[in-house]
Amino acid sequence: MSLVAIGINHKTATVDLREKVAFSPDKIHDAMKSLASRTRSGEAVIVSTCNRTELYCNNGDEADIIAWLEEYHGLDHKDVAPCLYNYHGQDAVRHLMRVASGLDSLILGEPQILGQVKQAFVKAKEAGTVALTIDRLFQNTFSVAKKVRTDTEIGAAAVSVAFAAVSMAKHIFSSISTTKVLLIGAGETIELVAKHLKDNGVASMVVANRTLERAQGMCEEFGATAITLAQIPDYLPKADIVISSTASPLPILGKGMVEKALKQRRHQPMLLVDIAVPRDIEPEVADLDDAFLYTVDDLHSIIEQNMASRKEAAEQAEVITEEQSFLFMDWIRSLESVDSIREYRSQSMAVKDELVERALNKLAQGSDTEQVLIELANRLTNKLIHAPTQALTAASRQGDLNTLGQLRSALGLDKN
């Protein structure tokens, strides 16, 4: 039984190559079936994300799996091979556990990868490419990833600007889900902020953007309201939280506009987070009572502290994955011993059945009973001690005292 993991990721390959070896969702079902057919066990799972493509197989040949990957995508070996990594046995188990725990991610400890690995496993089960070993491997991996999350602080601290902005809001407001949020901009960062806000239960979001169409497209996904930049003065007084990230060369929110909004709010506090470079919010806004302004520099300082915290947590997580990979391999070895015992017992029973049938035939032909029984006992003894005798002889000739000792112990010779 041999587990193999072969992959390519953000550390080993360019975006261009990663795109070429990725598997689209509509084709991954058939791809898993095709890959599984190249293994002796019929077990395979493909994990394919924007940052990695990894193939996990049981009883597969490494060279054959790599050849399959290249054939499937029509790629030359010389272009792919230098960017591939491979793991076997416990190393493969440990790698999968590290991946699912976020220890191998572009952003250390990010939680999204666990969901992606789970989704890949579900698709493999639907494709019929999961049996005992792979099933146990992935189920154990999910338990390990959960243990890493609960036993360490790897996911507790924000390490992206978007996540840090939302985390700051959560610390300032006792219940962020009831706040009203104004997002300025509709780029990738604001979209990620909106996702984090939605994940935290925020239902009231307004997105202001230079082009209304872009804002509307984003709002459909998050159930938000789209407005133009010109409408900001009308919506600003209603906002408890303002997060801005545009590409504007000039500030969008001035001190006067914010001051007017605070008066309309009867001086209820307002959190403003400016994650744009150059800045979207005039720095003088920080001088206003009830306005709490944070810039991207403030967030980066938090992120640096949090990254150090995550690295410390990652060291604890590495210990967990190491221990759990050992335990999984113990289970694998127990399976192998069960298979060996079953095979040995079956072989011995076959020898017995053959010799008993031969003895019964002789008795039916009138042979002397005592002679038949003696012959049966001798033949059975010779058959059963043949393989152990050969092993003892070979170990003795080679001077392999360790193997010789193990054989003597296994055969019970040291008890006499």
Curated annotation (Swiss-Prot):
Signal peptide: none annotated. One of its GO terms (biological process) is protoporphyrinogen IX biosynthetic process from glutamate. NADP(+) binds at G185, A186, G187, E188, T189, I190. The active site is at C50 (nucleophile). The keyword Magnesium does not apply. The record marks H95 as: Important for activity. Substrate binds at T49, C50, N51, R52, S105, E110, P111, Q112, Q116. One of its GO terms (molecular function) is glutamyl-tRNA reductase activity. Its EC number is 1.2.1.70. It catalyses: (S)-4-amino-5-oxopentanoate + tRNA(Glu) + NADP(+) = L-glutamyl-tRNA(Glu) + NADPH + H(+). Keywords: NADP, Oxidoreductase, Porphyrin biosynthesis. PANTHER family: GLUTAMYL-TRNA REDUCTASE (PTHR43013:SF1). Catalyzes the NADPH-dependent reduction of glutamyl-tRNA(Glu) to glutamate 1-semialdehyde (GSA). During catalysis, the active site Cys acts as a nucleophile attacking the alpha-carbonyl group of tRNA-bound glutamate with the formation of a thioester intermediate between enzyme and glutamate, and the concomitant release of tRNA(Glu). The thioester intermediate is finally reduced by direct hydride transfer from NADPH, to form the product GSA. Possesses an unusual extended V-shaped dimeric structure with each monomer consisting of three distinct domains arranged along a curved 'spinal' alpha-helix. The N-terminal catalytic domain specifically recognizes the glutamate moiety of the substrate. The second domain is the NADPH-binding domain, and the third C-terminal domain is responsible for dimerization. Homodimer. Belongs to the glutamyl-tRNA reductase family. This is Glutamyl-tRNA reductase. It comes from Shewanella baltica (strain OS155 / ATCC BAA-1091). The gene is hemA.
